[in-house]
Amino acid sequence: MSSNLQLVETFDSRQFVVARWNRNDTTAMVPSAIAVVVFVESVEYKLGCKEKIGYSPTPEDQDQFMILQMESIDEANRICHDSIAKGFAINNTKIVFTPLLGLNGFRLQDAIDFMKTSQPHFNNDELLEVLTMAICQELPERLKILEDGFSFIEQGVSELIQNSACEMFGSFASPVRRNGYSDIDINVESVSAPGQRVSTNVRPLNEVVANPKCLITHPLTKSELETYPQEEIIKILYRCFNENSAFKTKFEMRFLPARTPIIVFKNIEVEGMNVSYDLSVHNQISVEKASLLHEFIVKDKSKGSRMKNAMMFIVHWAKSNKLLSGDYPEEKLEVKTKLNSYIINQLVIHFVQAATNKVHVNPQAKRDSRVNEYNFDTLFGDYCKFFRELFKYYANFDFTNKAIYGKKAMQKKTLSSAHGGVEESPLMLMDPMDITHNISAKVTEDAVKLLNGLIRNALFILKQNHFHINYLLETNTMATMLMKSREPKISISTRVTDGAEHQYLSVQLPAVVITSSDLFLLLTRVLRFNVCPNEQGPSVVDLCTPTGAIFLVTSRAWVGRRNTKRALKNSRHDLTPLQIDVMCSDKYDYEEDIAELRISMSTVPGTRIRLACIDIMRGQVSEVRDAIHFLIDQFINNNYDDLEKNGVQTISRIPIAAPTWP
């Protein structure tokens, strides 16, 4: 562990505050970060270590922020309180101070900005661990309220159910899954002491439903708890709690009908604190599901439990990119995706088994024996490689037709018929602890489209030569920015040749394109450029001469590929992603002439930078630019690992797609 990482591990985030202001708040001079620091000190607030001040890395952005360490926790609380009570402004620009560690842990935007100020000091593995350390921090007062609330509910349950036992499960109860915003899941059972006589009498359910208050004098017995339907028990308990003035003072309560019905207790004692408890009865299956996730993490024998950090990061990634709701009001999704952290975690577990071609999880085994030991470092090496492989796997996953079933991916129709007509859905993921239950049945089609887009953009980020892993917290924004930053590699100029005005494209080629043979193969096989029939020759070597070779563009092989690729995937399960991409181009027929191009290749003197010079003799610049963007930013980028390992010429060994194939 680096010395910087050790400092982060020991720092108390309660001393830190976030200052925010907007450049559009005033027509006067917008305050700089230094001006904000001077202002804070001028009104006699005591700063801590000034070296730990984090500035917005983009001072030209509309929204500005700073992260400041105050001298003490009390001083941090004081400036945040005064920011609301008094209000601060510089040159009429309002400055707002909030705690870095809020009532419900780190805010999503604060975590993003905290990582921006941290990225110069850490490598990517360390950055990810900085984030997981941060989001695991929680306020002691929140913890106390959680524990007091649990004890209060536990006492209330004991008055309504004989020999009741309230068991915590889920992320809060797991040392390796708990974070600063975990809520509490509670399962209620009736447990008899050894030798204790248990009544087998069961009252008619309708009697108890008609008079729930009878439980105050005659609590539910173990036999009744195991006999009555779960939903009816939960409804009865809900009515009892909802008529209890002590509970109504402490909690906002609601009954939630679902496959596993629950009562949700939301603590209302502290304004703004999002603390809730989900209470279910006789729900051992959910306890075992949570136990499986816990065991999957603890069976990782890598140093520092890297799988724990990876899974915590991927859930936070989903929240930051609006696949899941956050824990503050402004972080709630306007349109629910119906995804949840359990589904996200199960997607990771499936990937690990599929990628290693090994069954790591045996759900039917006994607790603590359901997961085989493994080592994250041995399987994946580092976090970036893990996420690159994860997103690459799902970028090539056929969500339309395939379902996830443990280690396997199989046809939805096959799985549905094999398990008694399990409902098909846009995302179909079977619960490893209950193979008849599609846990993603309610996930919307729009959510799957959003997930798919995020996966592809995340993969694009991870394939860059230089990036920070926290870019993934703003996946679509950062991917768009990176794509735009690559555009200057294609420069356009106008020249007069033989009395005619020609437009030229100069293209910096990716490192995997080494020889003129490589470029020729990509142009003719992937883009379907056709050597001009009037051209004498040319041999491949001609691309390295100033005159190069002339090509006719007679099909738009870079447009509308998705359906063709999907059809190839479904008909040929033996094909690799590279083979599918190349064969997809084979399906394009020659059409009318779109453009005529003279293309040559050269190397920048004294460097390894290789350029393609494209003289547009006839045709639209936009068409040619789109074709080259597809070749470099999609085809080569998506298949970079294969092309780097095996060389571009491996494409020549891929059979041409037969006309009869889809």
UniProtKB/Swiss-Prot annotation:
Tissue expression notes: Ubiquitously expressed.
Q: What species does this protein belong to?
A: Caenorhabditis elegans
Q: Which Gene3D superfamilies match?
A: 1.10.1410.10, Beta Polymerase, domain 2
* Name this polypeptide is given: U6 snRNA-specific terminal uridylyltransferase
Q: Cite a single Pfam family from the UniProt record.
A: PAP_assoc
Report the EC number(s), separated by commas if there are several.
2.7.7.52
User: EC class of this enzyme?
Assistant: transferase
The reactions it catalyses are: RNA(n) + UTP = RNA(n)-3'-uridine ribonucleotide + diphosphate
- Which UniProt keywords are listed? Magnesium, Manganese, Metal-binding, Nucleotidyltransferase, Nucleus, Transferase
Q: What is the lineage of its organism?
A: Eukaryota, Metazoa, Ecdysozoa, Nematoda, Chromadorea
